[in-house]
């Protein structure tokens, strides 16, 4: 069993769930947005995924479950449980472990397709390197430049960002608009980008970010819920452009996501086996 925490309805597990199912695991879905409590560590199973959301990592007043999530993430890292934390999840993980998240990021928002700039550590990392290798191979097959395996296109959509990593963590990737894009703490892999997302989903997010920038709506959470009929044409066009850019790099996006699912499941099974032998 792998537990998936989905903070909001507009940032679903998407095709990452399909890829995890394809690896033969059972997913336990936890949805704070519908009233689910953050589970106790003993209920997690063999792995954890924490997804994104429009709320900030500091928004305990409106989302009191964030405090319980921080506590769970600390325990996950201490016990070396395989985990993936995405966007908001990565920001909450940084806060939980002693780092800092800026809301909003001093580097500004990021949306659409950006290039990950992989660190030297990424190629040797015990959790990340296999994922990178598979994504780079897919890029080469599709004729997408990687600068000798040091760059990868990914989908992003965020206003906030980690500005100081916790001690003892490994920086794995940056981007021009986000110095901390990917990092690891123990068996937890934290990703600012959205490997679960699709070109259609980034079209949805980008259009609403553009509408917010145009003053149509205030606040990221309100923008996420904006109906299509209320989007100005300029915002619709921004979303369409983002979708086209994502479709161009879809082979890499899929390869990264499938490899992420496979790596998480492999590590979760190893954790379960090790835990069983020590009982």
Where are the predicted features?
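Short glycine-/acidic-enriched loop or helix-start segments at secondary-structure transitions
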Residues: 13-15, 39, 59-61, 94-96, ...
């Amino acid at each position: 069993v792998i537990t998936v925490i989905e903070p909001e309805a507009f940032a679903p597990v998407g095709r990452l769930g399909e890829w995890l199912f394809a690896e033969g695991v059972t997913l336990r879905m936890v949805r704070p947005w519908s009233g689910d409590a953050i589970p106790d560590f003993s209920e997690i199973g063999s792995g954890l995924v924490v997804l994104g959301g429009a709320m900030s990592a500091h928004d305990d007043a409106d989302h009191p479950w964030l405090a319980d999530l921080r506590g769970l993430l600390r325990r996950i890292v201490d016990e070396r449980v395989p985990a993936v934390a995405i966007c908001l999840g990565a920001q909450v993980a940084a806060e939980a472990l002693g780092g800092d998240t800026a809301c909003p990021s001093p580097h500004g928002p990021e949306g659409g397709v950006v290039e990950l700039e992989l660190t030297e550590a990424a190629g040797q990392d015990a959790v990340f390197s296999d994922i990178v290798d598979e994504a780079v191979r897919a890029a080469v097959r599709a004729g997408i430049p990687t600068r000798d395996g040091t760059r990868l296109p990914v989908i992003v959509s965020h206003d906030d960002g980690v500005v100081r990593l916790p001690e003892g963590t490994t920086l794995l990737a940056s981007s021009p608009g986000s110095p901390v894009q990917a990092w690891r703490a123990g068996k937890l892999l934290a990703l600012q980008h959205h490997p679960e997302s699709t070109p259609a989903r980034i079209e949805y997010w980008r259009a609403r970010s553009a509408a917010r920038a145009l003053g149509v709506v205030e606040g990221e959470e309100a923008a996420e819920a904006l109906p299509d009929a209320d989007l100005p044409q300029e915002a619709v066009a921004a979303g369409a452009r983002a979708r086209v850019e994502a479709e161009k790099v879809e082979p890499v996006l899929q390869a990264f996501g499938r490899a992420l699912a496979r790596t998480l499941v492999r590590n979760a099974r190893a954790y379960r086996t090790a835990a069983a032998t020590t009982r």
